[in-house]
Amino acid sequence: LSQSAISQRIKLLEARVGQPVLVRATPPSPTEVGRQLLNHVQQVRLLERDLQRQVPALDEEGMPERLRIALNADSLATWWAGAVGNFCAQQNVLTDLVVEDQEVGLKRMRAGEVAACLCGSERPVAGARSLLLGAMRYRALASPGFMARHFPQGFVASRLARTPAIVYGPDDFLQHRYLASLGIEDGFLHHLCPSSEGFLRMTEAGLGWGLVPELQAREQLASGQLVEICSDTPIDVPLYWHHWRNGGQLLAQLTDHLRHTAQQ
């Protein structure tokens, strides 16, 4: 399709619904009605797949279904692939993963951009359900060299805001929560590193302290490459799986699979 053809179809759709479906900006974004239409299309596509499986003659192309899912980088770097690998292979499913912080992933679903998401919020958007899968345990870690430089006499909480931290991105408030738990409410020095793997490598290199998933740092903790800056002060972050209520059999099966995997 040409750009002019796409523009014409959008105008025809807007004439039909009687209002704009797109905000003409850079980049463009859907209006509230546009988001409702996107959500509807997501659900209809999943329901169509159910029908094609029941009536194979309708599936002329025979292509795998693609699920667009928002999830946080730490889940992707640790447990996600192992949890869904067999399911995707057996169901012939491709995934289109959108990496967002666990605090904001739900915005993608509300905007109609994804069929499901993992996030830290329990409250689902309209037309969706949420399921608690469990919690990711984070520990505040640093390299022994970092601790020797910044805390030569031992850890002092009041000095933590003046030592470099590592933050995943502007929507990552985990370090803020940790500092608040120690009575520190002011701003703090920090690097920005939008990569879960890079976050861990920067911590290992002594560039700063950071909250790292326990799952991701087991080897480093066991070898002494990383240490807790303050012993036994973990933060548990709940993980909720959000999915459309009318998302079809495939999404329901994936939800059941994740529920069963989480129970193990």
Please place each PLM-identified region on the residue numbering.
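Alpha-helical linker/hinge and terminal dimerization helices associated
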Residues: R16-V17, L37-E61, L258
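Central regulatory/effector-binding core of bacterial HTH transcription factors
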Residues: M63-A126
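Secondary-structure junction motif
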Residues: A161-E185
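A short LG(V/I)-centered, amphipathic sequence patch enriched
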Residues: L12-E32
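Helix-turn-helix DNA-binding motif, specifically the short coil turn and the N-cap/start of the second
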Residues: L1-A5, R9
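Flexible hinge/capping segments at coil-to-helix
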Residues: A128-I166
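A late-sequence structural motif
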Residues: S231-Q264
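Hydrophobic hinge/microswitch elements
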Residues: R110, I184-I229
